[in-house]
Amino acid sequence: TLKGEVPDLTNCEVLGPNNNLKFEGNVSVESNVLFDLRKGPVLISDGAEIQSNTRIDGPAYIGEKTQIRSAQIRSGTSIGHHCKIGGEVECSIISSYSNKAHDGFLGHSYVGEWVNIGAGTSNSDLKNTYGAIKMNVGNVEVNTASNKIGCFISDYVKTSIGCFIYTGKRIGVASHIHGYVTEDVPSFTIHAKSLTGKSFELHKNSAIETQKRIMKRRNRNQTSYEKDLLNQVFEMTQDERYIAGVLKTDFSM
């Protein structure tokens, strides 16, 4: 059971049973926030900040010290701790220390830790035909039997501004994506095919240095374990990049 001080909701609106709104610790809720509890509970953890003009539809979870920036949080969304979230998020899991601070749509998707989703990035979670979405899993095409599947974004991924990700696409660890993403992206790849026709390998030393920088911004010290893990993933995914035709040259536009 979550127990905490209930913030002042005088200038907010609550739809549905009040006991479906739970606060843990001290939560900041600004004016003009709407909580829709008719489909399920909304749970908000200690230190979270809900800014004005936000709508949160239950069931939903907002993690510790996460900031919701005038966003639309739709049903079925779970957001980890120390995240910054804006735009629209629907039926998605966003892991801790990941940012989607700007406008853009994220739906029926999974986002790993330490991800940064650039301004205007959006994903598709529905085909134009409304048919079942097919995915490539282990070089085998799989019919998911679902018409609502977004994208799967691994740890440490960075998306550029104005990036568009098609249905059912997987983005590998530490990759950078630009423009339109119409195919799966291997780990440690700078994917810019819609802009340059090419994808380039992201050197593991660059990924490790970026890891160090982003952790420092969150007052975290990079550990030898975390560096070693990136090293190992880089080695384990070399065949993926080779099969995908990723170039071992410096990225250029």
Regions inferred by a protein language model and the residue ranges of each:
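Membrane-embedded translocation segments of transport machinery
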Residues: Y61, Q67-R69
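Active-site-adjacent structural elements in folded domains
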Residues: F35-D36, A48-T54, R69, T77-K84, ...
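Extended, small-residue-rich solenoid/repeat segments and analogous flexible loops
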Residues: T1-Y61
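Glycine-rich beta-solenoid repeat tracts in large extracellular/virion proteins
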Residues: L34-L37, R55-D57, I73-R74, S122-N123, ...
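Glycine-rich hexapeptide-repeat left-handed beta-helix
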Residues: S70-A71, H82-L247
